[in-house]
Amino acid sequence: MITTLITHVLNPLAYIVPVLLAVAFLTLLERKVLGYMQLRKGPNIVGPYGLLQPIADGLKLFIKEPVRPSTSSPFLFLATPMLALTLALTLWAPMPIPYPVTDLNLGVLFVLALSSLAVYSILGSGWASNSKYALIGALRAVAQTISYEVSLGLILLSVIIFTGGFTLQTFNIAQESIWLVVPAWPLAALWYISTLAETNRAPFDFTEGESELVSGFNVEYAGGPFALFFLAEYANILLMNTLSAILFLGATHIPALPELTAMNLMTKAALLSVVFLWVRASYPRFRYDQLMHLVWKSFLPMTLALVLWHLALPIALAGLPPQI
């Protein structure tokens, strides 16, 4: 009974609550970083240094009346934000920080499969809103996400060839002598840009395209459902950066001090997230055709070539003794 309680209630809560807290403070960090980059303060009224701003924001959104457009489809309209957040939080389960909540043998495949399911929540919300702006935003988001998933999958394949397994824990072991970002820096660069596009962040924020589509697929959402989408988006950003840190900046795992590994990984993920915000502050939005050209004409040939290269190298050098 107690074991069931721990595995089914306490363990999931112990990873969901910190993720949601991290998401809340990432929104504050974003506003602060953008503020200082635009030579202003950012939120600094609610609590010391504005630290309670995300809590006030969340409270404000959840106590608002959930307004639903009269022409929208009632069930799908409310189901999609819940689906988005559920998927975003489930994706954290196989993350080795340093021990995962669910020890999956094919962790990499699980992450890839679930992140592609997130497309349905965006498409469903755009369609259920019954608004042309929301639908255009949703269609753009789906096209963008599906396109960049191709390059993400191929990059993951190359990294798996390096590591020799689909289990996420093996990445930490494989990088004990050197971070994969050093021998595979082109992969790391392609991966980072693809994660920017995958999470719909600037300069690839076509889903939200404020100057064109009001707010994109979530234009008709207000209050609680909007907050769920918002949480899902930022949880995905943190997840992608944690995954980038695991894949390319692996933390050495000391069994006696697992907390050190967790702090190591989270520091790297936080720094990568700050670079996400820096990119947002620095770059204007791409044109849509340029975005598609980038992935199909540049990233796809490069990632395919790198997969073949990394496959060919060990076979070509198989006859050499290991000490060379």
From Swiss-Prot:
Entry's EC annotation: 7.1.1.2
Organism domain of life: Eukaryota
Membrane-traversing stretches: 9-29, 75-95, 106-126, 146-166, 177-197, 237-257, 259-279, 299-319
Main location as per UniProt: mitochondrion
InterPro entries: NADH_UbQ_OxRdtase_su1/FPO, NADH_UbQ_OxRdtase_su1_CS
Any one of the GO BP annotations: aerobic respiration
Gene Ontology terms for molecular function: NADH dehydrogenase (ubiquinone) activity
Reactions this protein catalyses: a ubiquinone + NADH + 5 H(+)(in) = a ubiquinol + NAD(+) + 4 H(+)(out)
EC class name: translocase
Gene Ontology cellular component list: mitochondrial inner membrane
Record localization: Mitochondrion inner membrane
Record keywords: Electron transport, Membrane, Mitochondrion, Mitochondrion inner membrane, NAD, Respiratory chain, Translocase, Transmembrane, Transmembrane helix, Transport, Ubiquinone
Bilayer topology term: Multi-pass membrane protein
Family, per entry: Belongs to the complex I subunit 1 family.
PANTHER family: NADH DEHYDROGENASE SUBUNIT 1 (PTHR11432), NADH-UBIQUINONE OXIDOREDUCTASE CHAIN 1 (PTHR11432:SF3)
Purpose of the protein: Core subunit of the mitochondrial membrane respiratory chain NADH dehydrogenase (Complex I) that is believed to belong to the minimal assembly required for catalysis. Complex I functions in the transfer of electrons from NADH to the respiratory chain. The immediate electron acceptor for the enzyme is believed to be ubiquinone.
Protein name: NADH-ubiquinone oxidoreductase chain 1
Name of the encoding gene: MT-ND1
